[in-house]
């Protein structure tokens, strides 16, 4: 077998990936690691133009190509436009990672209709229509990878019902969408991160730890590490590595599943 055609496990050379909400945080790590594996990457952002463009340059340094496309995927017409533009960049689309989302905390008696709609519009409705457009545009044998959370099924957090529920719906989506997408041999899965050290983590970590407001951000991070038997924090690259596996040929037989990426917490 010639080197030109030899399959290298977990490589994504020749593939094109779109990652929504990838200007920073976990999404940026997904885009970076997909690029490191050889994929060309479309970095989607809603507002973080500067960081998205910087990420594009970092991905190019890995020896592949990348572009940034703006769209707010909480708005379906913009999602439709994003995919129409994405398919024109390199003429194909093989991997779609639905990452954009927001966090929310509030006791049941405090939650307003406006907050409910904000969270579900982005975390649930937005992801559903990203998946719809992905199915329309992906090549046969493509990958759809959605974003859940370990709080959707394994880790109940007080005052976190909206967020947890919005992510729990994703786990139901992937089970059914995996069947719906079978005609095109597209697999549909989700990753469910635990606490992951990003700027968002530092903003909200006090909610996850009882009495968390009494501690500094650094102290809360150290305490969070003990949620895992490995006694370390999760980082965006941990989530991204799972995504690369699901996107690869080696991940083909995983379908309709939600993969917990939380260090056993």
Curated annotation (Swiss-Prot):
InterPro entries xref list: NAD(P)-bd_dom_sf, Sc_DH/Rdtase_CS, SDR_fam
Domain of life: Eukaryota
Induction annotation: The expression of the dibenzodioxocinones biosynthesis cluster is positively regulated by the transcription factor dibT.
SUPFAM superfamilies given in the database record: NAD(P)-binding Rossmann-fold domains
Keyword tags: NADP, Oxidoreductase
Keyword Nucleus: no
Keyword presence, Cell inner membrane: no
Entry's Gene Ontology molecular function annotations: oxidoreductase activity
SMART domains: PKS_KR
The protein's annotated pathway: Secondary metabolite biosynthesis
Family from the record: Belongs to the short-chain dehydrogenases/reductases (SDR) family.
Protein name per the record: Short-chain dehydrogenase/reductase GME11373
Species assigned in the record: Pestalotiopsis microspora
